Amino acid sequence: MSELVYKEESYSIIGLCMEVHNQLGHGFSEIVYKDALEFEFSENGIVYEREKEYPVFYKGNLLKHKFYADFVVLDKIILEVKCVKCITDEHESQAINYLKVSDNRLALLVNFARGKMEHKRIIY
């Protein structure tokens, strides 16, 4: 059995997401959960960037479109916050796009819209 990529780090991040969900419950918009996560990261001394911008290149040329990851945590894990009925293939594709342009290996998709927080690991 293979070892989980960034096991301890991802457990810490998911734990903070669970704390936010336990405190706020479901029903808020994404921005509220992002603000709460930013608070938790700061309170727990976890290094993060919010709305991290990633340029896209084609044949060495900068394209007009850029990607914006909700969070990059510990300079290596992308965290995408969702408030949707369920995590879909489109959400996973979005995370893969972020992984491709960032050269990171792990993205965490976290859905706060349900009574029980849903999360998914995306490895690239």
Residue locations for each model-derived region?
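Solvent-exposed, charged helical/coil patches
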Residues: M1-V47, M117, I123-Y124
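Conserved catalytic cores of phosphodiester-cleaving nucleases, focusing on short active-site segments
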Residues: G25, A69-K85, Y98
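A short acidic/basic microdomain associated with nuclease active sites
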Residues: N44-Y58
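Well-ordered beta-strand positions
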Residues: E49, D70-V72, K100, N111
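Basic/aromatic recognition patch in beta-strand/loop cores that engages polyanionic ligands
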Residues: L62-A69
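Nucleic-acid nuclease catalytic cores
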Residues: K82-Y124
